[in-house]
Amino acid sequence: MKHIRNFSIIAHIDHGKSTLSDRLIQECGGLTDREMAAQVLDSMDIERERGITIKAQSVTLDYLANDGETYQLNFIDTPGHVDFSYEVSRSLAACEGALLVVDAGQGVEAQTLANCYTALEMDMDVVPVLNKIDLPQADPDRVAEEIEDIVGIEATDAVRCSAKTGVGIKDVLEVIVAQIPPPEGDPEGPLQALIIDSWFDSYLGVVSLVRIKNGVLKKGDKFKVMSTGQNYNADRVGIFTPKQTDTTELKTGEVGFVIAGIKEIHGAPVGDTLTHSKHGAEKALAGFKKVKPQVYAGLFPISTDDYENFRDALNKLSLNDASLFFEPETSSALGFGFRIGFLGLLHMEIIQERLEREYNLELITTAPTVVYEIVQTNGETIYVDNPSDLPAINNIAEMREPIVETNILVPKEYLGNVITLCIEKRGVQTNLVYHGNQVALTYELPMAEVVMDFFDRLKSTSRGYASLEYNFIRFEPADMVRLDILINGDRVDALAMIIHKGLIRSKGLALVNKMKELIPRQMFDIAVQAAVGSQIIARSSIKAMRKDVTAKCYGGDVSRKKKLLNKQKEGKKRMKQVGNVEVPQEAFLAVLKLND
C-alpha cells in the first residue's frame, strides 16, 4: 500500500491539465506511441471540440521511480470550468493529494483558487506545478510568487515543466512520489468502497468507478449497495490504463471499476458505499454533498413521439451526472417536456448537446430561470423556478432572489471595465485586493444576472483575462415581476420571464420588437404585446399580407369593388378569431439573446 499514490490534477481552464495527463501516461508507458492521441482522457466528442474537460476520468499507471521502487499512480483528470466544480470535489474525495497546475504565463486565476481551496478544505496535500515554461511569455519566478501571495502555499521549489515539449515531466513524477502521502486504510477490515462516478453502458449495464477505502474487492464477490441494500455479483473488476483492463481484485487504496450487471439506472448512485453482502461494514462512508441546481429551463422534444426516449435519455444522463434534476412539465405552446435543473449555462448547453448527439433527440429550450423564494400573503414560503408557477401579484407579500458571492481575478488595466459591468448587473462590491498585477474583486450579484450572460460579457470586457467563480450565499428581497408575452391576446407560457422592475420597459420593448422580426406574417394582423399583470407595457403589430381582391375587376361599378373588399374584411375578421399563429423555434431562443 505504501507504493500507491492517488492524486487529482486541478487547474484553471486552459492551464494544461489534460496535456499534462497525456505526458504522464506516455512517460509511464500507459499507451504505445501509436495509440497516443491528444487529450486521451477527453473521450466525449463535445470535450474534444470545445477543448474542455467535462467529466473527471481516472487512470492507473505504474512508475519506476529513481529509488528503484515501482509505484502505482492513480490519477484523476478534473474539469476546470466553474459549472463543473462538483466534479472536482468528487474526484478529490478519492485522493490524498492534488497537483495544482498553473500556467507560467497567465499566472493564478479564479478557478485555480477555488479548486485549490476545495482541496485544502479536505485536508489534502497540494503540490504546485508550473506548466508551459516553453512559452516566450512565461515568467515562472513571478508566478511562483503569485502562488505564495494569493493562494498561500509554498511554491519556491515548485516543479517547472512543459507538458507540450515534455520538459520536466520526470520531475513531476518524482514530486508526486515524494510529496503526496500513500493512502491509509485497513486491508484486513470489512470492505468499504466509495462510488466516485458511474455511467451506463448498453451492453454491460451500470459501470461504477470506485475507490477502495478498506478491505479488498475480488472478482466474483457478492456485494451490496448500502443505500438501497440491493445485492449484486462483481462480474468484472479492473483498472483504466487508460484502456479498460480487467484484474482479479481491487486492493485497499486502489481506484478502479466494477461491473455487476446492474440494469436499473439508479442501482448504484454516486457517493454511495459498497460492502460485502456477508460480514460487511456497519456504516457507510461519508458521501458527497448533493449539489443543488442553480438554473432551471424547460426542454421539450420537437416531435411528441420522442417523449419516452427523452425520459430514458435523461435517466441515463442523470446517472453519469449527479447534479441533474428533472420533472415532467407541460406547456400549452410546446406540449410535453421536462423542467430540468442545471448548475449553470455551460452545463445547460453541454447537457442539451449531449441529449441531441448521444440520443438523437431534437429539442426546444425555454429561457433559463433561477429559483426565487416567495413569501405569500398567507405567510407560506414557496420556491418557484418556473415563471408560469408564479402566484398572482396580489398573493405575493415578498419576493426574494438568490444572491451569489462572485470572486473575480482581473489584471488591473481591465479593472474599470469589470467594475462597470458588475454595477450594470446590480452588483454590490464587498472586497478589492491588489496582488501584484492582479486584482481580486469580490461582488455580491443577483444570480439571475450571473447565469444569463455575465460570463461572456466578463470575458469580452477584459479581453479574456478576467476569471470568475461564484457560490450561492442567500436570498434577498427584490422587486421582481413576471413579464408575459401575448400574441393576439393569448399568453405564450414558454416566453414568460421573471425580471427586475427597473428593466421592464426596455426588456419588454426589445422582446416585442424581436418577436415582430421572427414571427412570420399571416393573412391577418397580429398584435404582439408585453404585459405585467394586466398592464400592457409594449406593443407592436405584424401587418397582414395584402391580397388584391379587386385586381380582376377593371372598369365596372364601384359597388362591385366594395362588395369584394367587404367580403375580404369579413373573412379576415373570421380568420382572426380562429387563426393560430405559429411561433417559430428561434422566437423561444430570442429571449436568451436579447442583449446582443
From Swiss-Prot:
Protein name per its UniProtKB record:
Elongation factor 4
Its cellular-component GO annotations read: plasma membrane
CDD domains for this protein: EF4_II, EF4_III, LepA, lepA_C
Describe the task this protein carries out. Answer: Required for accurate and efficient protein synthesis under certain stress conditions. May act as a fidelity factor of the translation reaction, by catalyzing a one-codon backward translocation of tRNAs on improperly translocated ribosomes. Back-translocation proceeds from a post-translocation (POST) complex to a pre-translocation (PRE) complex, thus giving elongation factor G a second chance to translocate the tRNAs correctly. Binds to ribosomes in a GTP-dependent manner.
The protein's Enzyme Commission number: 3.6.5.n1
Gene encoding this polypeptide?
Answer: lepA
A molecular function annotated in GO for this UniProt entry is: GTP binding
Q: Which UniProt keywords apply?
A: Cell inner membrane, Cell membrane, GTP-binding, Hydrolase, Membrane, Nucleotide-binding, Protein biosynthesis
Q: InterPro entries of this UniProt entry?
A: EF-4 (IPR006297), EFG_III/V (IPR035647), EFG_V-like (IPR000640), EFTu-like_2 (IPR004161), G_TR_CS (IPR031157), LepA_C_sf (IPR038363), LepA_CTD (IPR013842), LepA_IV (IPR035654)
Ligand binding (GTP): D14, H15, G16, K17, S18, T19, N131, K132, I133, D134
What subcellular compartments does it reside in? Cell inner membrane
